[in-house]
Swiss-Prot record:
Encoding gene (name): ndk
Subunit structure: Homotetramer.
The species this protein was found in: Nitrosomonas eutropha (strain DSM 101675 / C91 / Nm57)
Family of the protein in this entry: Belongs to the NDK family.
Protein name as it appears in the record: Nucleoside diphosphate kinase
Catalytic residues (UniProt): 117
Length: 141
Protein backbone atom coordinates (compact mmCIF):
# COMPACT_ATOMS: atom_id res chain seq x y z
CA UNK A 1 0.00 0.00 0.00
CA UNK A 2 1.08 3.53 -0.77
CA UNK A 3 1.45 6.21 1.89
CA UNK A 4 -0.12 9.37 0.48
CA UNK A 5 -0.93 12.88 1.57
CA UNK A 6 -4.20 14.64 0.87
CA UNK A 7 -5.59 18.07 1.60
CA UNK A 8 -8.71 18.26 3.73
CA UNK A 9 -10.73 21.38 4.50
CA UNK A 10 -13.42 21.50 7.14
CA UNK A 11 -15.71 24.12 5.64
CA UNK A 12 -17.38 27.10 7.37
CA UNK A 13 -20.65 25.26 8.06
CA UNK A 14 -18.94 22.44 9.96
CA UNK A 15 -16.60 24.83 11.80
CA UNK A 16 -19.66 26.84 12.92
CA UNK A 17 -21.29 23.64 14.20
CA UNK A 18 -18.22 22.99 16.38
CA UNK A 19 -17.61 19.49 14.97
CA UNK A 20 -13.90 19.83 14.13
CA UNK A 21 -12.93 17.39 16.89
CA UNK A 22 -15.52 14.84 15.80
CA UNK A 23 -14.23 15.00 12.23
CA UNK A 24 -10.59 14.71 13.38
CA UNK A 25 -11.56 11.63 15.42
CA UNK A 26 -12.87 10.01 12.24
CA UNK A 27 -9.62 10.77 10.40
CA UNK A 28 -7.59 9.21 13.20
CA UNK A 29 -9.89 6.18 13.59
CA UNK A 30 -9.36 5.50 9.87
CA UNK A 31 -5.58 5.52 10.31
CA UNK A 32 -5.00 8.99 8.88
CA UNK A 33 -2.51 11.27 10.62
CA UNK A 34 -2.77 15.06 10.67
CA UNK A 35 0.69 16.22 9.53
CA UNK A 36 -0.12 19.92 9.08
CA UNK A 37 -3.07 22.05 10.19
CA UNK A 38 -4.24 25.62 10.54
CA UNK A 39 -7.42 27.58 10.90
CA UNK A 40 -7.95 30.40 8.42
CA UNK A 41 -10.57 32.79 7.17
CA UNK A 42 -10.00 32.65 3.42
CA UNK A 43 -9.93 35.84 1.43
CA UNK A 44 -11.94 36.08 -1.77
CA UNK A 45 -8.72 35.82 -3.81
CA UNK A 46 -7.59 32.70 -1.91
CA UNK A 47 -10.95 31.00 -2.43
CA UNK A 48 -11.11 31.98 -6.10
CA UNK A 49 -7.58 30.71 -6.70
CA UNK A 50 -8.16 27.48 -4.80
CA UNK A 51 -11.35 26.69 -6.74
CA UNK A 52 -10.10 28.14 -10.07
CA UNK A 53 -10.80 24.81 -11.79
CA UNK A 54 -14.52 25.56 -11.28
CA UNK A 55 -14.35 29.20 -12.45
CA UNK A 56 -16.62 28.62 -15.48
CA UNK A 57 -19.14 26.50 -13.59
CA UNK A 58 -22.49 28.05 -12.60
CA UNK A 59 -21.91 27.36 -8.89
CA UNK A 60 -18.48 29.08 -8.72
CA UNK A 61 -19.65 32.42 -7.29
CA UNK A 62 -21.79 30.78 -4.60
CA UNK A 63 -18.96 28.39 -3.71
CA UNK A 64 -16.53 31.26 -3.23
CA UNK A 65 -19.07 33.23 -1.16
CA UNK A 66 -19.64 30.20 1.05
CA UNK A 67 -15.93 29.50 1.52
CA UNK A 68 -15.27 33.08 2.67
CA UNK A 69 -18.34 33.19 4.95
CA UNK A 70 -16.42 32.04 8.02
CA UNK A 71 -13.28 30.31 9.19
CA UNK A 72 -12.18 26.95 7.81
CA UNK A 73 -9.89 24.29 9.25
CA UNK A 74 -7.28 23.20 6.72
CA UNK A 75 -5.23 20.07 7.26
CA UNK A 76 -2.92 17.67 5.47
CA UNK A 77 -3.72 14.03 6.14
CA UNK A 78 -1.17 11.27 5.67
CA UNK A 79 -1.63 7.52 5.54
CA UNK A 80 -2.01 4.47 3.37
CA UNK A 81 -4.29 5.36 0.45
CA UNK A 82 -5.09 8.64 2.22
CA UNK A 83 -6.90 10.17 -0.76
CA UNK A 84 -9.38 7.32 -1.24
CA UNK A 85 -9.76 6.80 2.51
CA UNK A 86 -10.59 10.47 3.09
CA UNK A 87 -13.05 10.52 0.20
CA UNK A 88 -14.77 7.45 1.65
CA UNK A 89 -14.99 9.14 5.06
CA UNK A 90 -16.44 12.31 3.49
CA UNK A 91 -19.18 10.56 1.51
CA UNK A 92 -20.95 11.81 -1.61
CA UNK A 93 -20.78 15.54 -2.42
CA UNK A 94 -24.55 15.76 -1.94
CA UNK A 95 -25.22 14.79 1.69
CA UNK A 96 -28.64 13.45 0.69
CA UNK A 97 -26.80 10.82 -1.38
CA UNK A 98 -24.03 10.20 1.17
CA UNK A 99 -23.96 6.88 2.98
CA UNK A 100 -25.04 6.89 6.62
CA UNK A 101 -22.10 7.41 8.94
CA UNK A 102 -20.06 9.54 6.53
CA UNK A 103 -19.01 13.06 7.46
CA UNK A 104 -21.38 14.67 4.96
CA UNK A 105 -24.34 12.48 5.93
CA UNK A 106 -23.80 13.34 9.59
CA UNK A 107 -22.74 17.01 9.48
CA UNK A 108 -23.62 18.62 6.11
CA UNK A 109 -26.76 20.63 5.39
CA UNK A 110 -26.90 20.43 1.61
CA UNK A 111 -24.79 20.13 -1.53
CA UNK A 112 -23.54 23.71 -1.11
CA UNK A 113 -22.81 23.60 2.63
CA UNK A 114 -21.36 20.10 2.53
CA UNK A 115 -18.97 20.26 5.51
CA UNK A 116 -15.68 19.13 3.95
CA UNK A 117 -13.38 19.24 0.94
CA UNK A 118 -10.86 16.55 0.03
CA UNK A 119 -8.38 16.17 -2.80
CA UNK A 120 -9.49 13.78 -5.53
CA UNK A 121 -6.14 12.56 -6.92
CA UNK A 122 -2.42 12.58 -6.08
CA UNK A 123 -1.74 15.38 -8.57
CA UNK A 124 -4.46 17.66 -7.21
CA UNK A 125 -3.45 16.80 -3.63
CA UNK A 126 0.10 18.02 -4.29
CA UNK A 127 -1.15 21.29 -5.81
CA UNK A 128 -3.76 21.85 -3.09
CA UNK A 129 -1.33 21.14 -0.25
CA UNK A 130 1.20 23.59 -1.73
CA UNK A 131 -1.56 26.21 -1.93
CA UNK A 132 -1.79 26.34 1.89
CA UNK A 133 1.37 24.79 3.35
CA UNK A 134 5.04 25.29 2.47
CA UNK A 135 6.76 21.89 2.57
CA UNK A 136 8.63 22.94 5.73
CA UNK A 137 5.28 23.10 7.58
CA UNK A 138 4.27 19.49 6.82
CA UNK A 139 5.66 16.92 9.26
CA UNK A 140 5.57 13.16 8.81
CA UNK A 141 4.93 11.31 12.06
Amino acid sequence: MVVERTLSIIKPDAVAKNVIGQIYARFEAAGLKVVAARMAHLSRVEAENFYAIHRERPFFKDLVEFMISGPVMIQVLEGENAIAKNRELMGATDPKKAEKGTIRADFAENIDANAVHGSDAPETAAVEIACFFPSLEVYSR
